[in-house]
């Protein structure tokens, strides 16, 4: 029964992603029909203005697929490592930590390339994840969902104040950082795709390899240790994969919130907690969600556009509140 549900969910997710891909290419300041999109993708028919529009939008769509998949898988890994349903790069303050290191790089080292952003974002995200989990673990009951959310909010607020302190004195730094901070895939190019793709492949392969150990970890630290699992090593590898996926995407697209929260949580409700199924489905679902958000941003903001990070925040904030209410977590 569960296998049948998984197959149906996977088929529906893939169909949804294909639709979002076509919509992402078709919609914009100049709308293009689906038949034209399909002909252009396969280089059928004559060279027209519409075909050129389609070809110009393909990099944005491909980058959106990689970015959405990376953020969603990162969220699934963080939820599994912390055994916490609300773990997410944005809620845990990881995005803000990456932002702080990036703005420091812009202000003090005058960096301006995505390849340089990536390693700064990775360092900031990793240090923030360790800090937040350490703060949430203080006191009884360990890192509960509410304590993680509070620690993430506190760390995020403190780090954001540092971001503002570094950014505000310089108009040039502010201008360069401001557009990046909103979270957007609109300016993506094939160069960005070539930068992001290796990190996605490495992070995704490591996450798939960690699926079985993470299933064992879900039984609890003591039970997992009794079954022969190296718990610290499992957490370390899974966390590194999650931070790598999140940081590389954040460096190139800016901080995009709630993708890593909504998608894995939804699939966990539908197909259960098996990470072997959740991780690949999260990749497909995250890609579809980010493309949907990007497309809606273009439609709602026409003739301009809303950044995809704003749209995901508008969708994700109510979902976050519903998850918190459903969890009914009262312990601090």
Regions from the PLM with identified roles:
Residues 1-332:
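Alpha-helical transmembrane segments in inner-membrane proteins
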């Amino acid at each position: 029964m569960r296998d049948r549900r998984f197959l149906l969910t996977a088929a529906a997710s893939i169909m949804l992603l294909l639709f979002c891909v076509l919509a992402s290419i078709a919609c914009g300041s100049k709308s293009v029909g689906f038949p034209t999109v399909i002909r252009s993708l396969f280089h059928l028919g004559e060279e027209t203005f519409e075909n050129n529009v389609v070809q110009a939008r393909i990099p944005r769509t491909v980058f959106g697929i990689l970015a959405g998949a990376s953020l969603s898988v990162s969220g699934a890994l963080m939820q599994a490592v912390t055994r916490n349903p609300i773990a997410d790069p944005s809620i845990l303050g990881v995005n803000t930590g990456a932002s702080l290191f990036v703005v420091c790089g812009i202000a003090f080292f005058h960096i301006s390339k995505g390849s340089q952003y990536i390693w700064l974002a990775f360092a900031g995200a990793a240090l923030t994840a360790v800090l937040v989990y350490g703060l949430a673990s203080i006191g009884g009951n360990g890192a509960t969902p509410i304590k993680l959310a509070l620690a993430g909010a506190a760390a995020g607020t403190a780090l954001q104040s540092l971001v503002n302190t570094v950014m505000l004195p310089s108009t040039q730094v502010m201008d360069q950082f401001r557009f990046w901070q909103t979270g957007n895939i609109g300016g993506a190019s094939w160069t960005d795709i070539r930068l992001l793709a290796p990190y996605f492949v490495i992070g995704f392969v490591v996450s798939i390899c960690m699926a079985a150990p993470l299933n064992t970890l879900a039984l609890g630290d003591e039970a997992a240790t009794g079954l022969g699992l190296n718990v610290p090593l499992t957490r370390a590898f899974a966390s590194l994969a999650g931070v790598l996926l999140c940081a590389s995407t954040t460096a190139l697209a800016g901080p995009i919130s709630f993708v890593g929260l909504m998608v894995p949580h939804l699939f966990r409700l539908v197909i259960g907690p098996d990470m072997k199924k959740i991780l690949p489905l999260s990749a497909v679902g995250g890609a579809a969600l980010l493309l949907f958000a990007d497309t809606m941003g273009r439609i709602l903001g026409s003739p301009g556009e809303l950044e995809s990070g704003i749209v995901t925040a508008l969708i994700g904030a109510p979902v976050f509140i519903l998850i918190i209410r459903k969890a009914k977590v009262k312990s601090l």
